[in-house]
A protein has these predicted regions:
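C-terminal catalytic/acceptor-binding lobe
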Residues: 69-71, 88-180
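Conserved catalytic core of nucleotide-sugar-dependent glycosyltransferases
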Residues: 1-97, 105
């Protein structure tokens, strides 16, 4: 990339940026949604102002079912002021006391994804599509050919998993945001 993504996010008032959106393993996230709903119900002051502009539908199916979508923390950019905020601190402490981090292996990506999706206006969350990512099992590569050439990417676009609905939730994010 030939521009400073952090500067761009700051200038565009983005709180959170991600490259990969994954589906969590159901057994390690079974009880977290109930705790999330309970926290939300007892802390309405944090949610009412942004509820209609949030990404709640990204992580929720129907009225109260979690779909196991989360933003991977493998490559993310986040404004630390949000993670240090009273609302997130209270939320994280509540989730920690619920015991799921220790007993059910709730990951930081699940907890943070629920927070971003319900506490941050959708327009402040950004899919960073020009940024690639690769590990043993995962390849995220810009799908746009022009962008791929312009940013001198070396990843294999054919191996990209970003829009595989069985593995990721990137398309769900785009659908929720009205991006096609």
């Amino acid at each position: 990339m030939e521009y400073d993504i952090m500067r761009w996010m700051q200038d565009n008032r983005k709180i959170f940026g991600f490259t990969l959106s994954i589906k969590e393993i159901e057994r390690s996230a079974k009880k977290i949604w109930g705790h999330n709903l309970n926290f939300t119900a007892h802390n309405r002051e944090f949610y009412n102002p942004i509820e209609k502009s949030s990404l709640r539908s990204y992580i929720q199916v129907g009225r109260d079912t979690y779909n196991y979508c989360s933003f991977s923390t493998d490559l993310q950019i986040v404004n630390l002021n949000f993670l240090r905020s009273p609302v997130y601190t209270k939320y994280f402490e509540y989730m920690d006391k619920a015991g799921g981090i220790f007993y059910e292996r709730w990951s930081d990506s699940i907890i943070q994804s629920m927070a971003y999706s319900t506490m941050v206006p959708a327009k402040m969350i950004q899919h960073i599509s020009p940024m690639g990512y690769q590990n043993k099992e995962t390849v995220v590569c810009p799908a746009d050919d022009i962008m791929w050439r312009e940013y001198k990417c070396e990843c294999d676009q054919g191996s990209d998993i970003s829009f595989n609905r069985d593995l990721t939730c990137t398309q769900r994010y785009k659908d929720t945001q009205g991006m096609f």
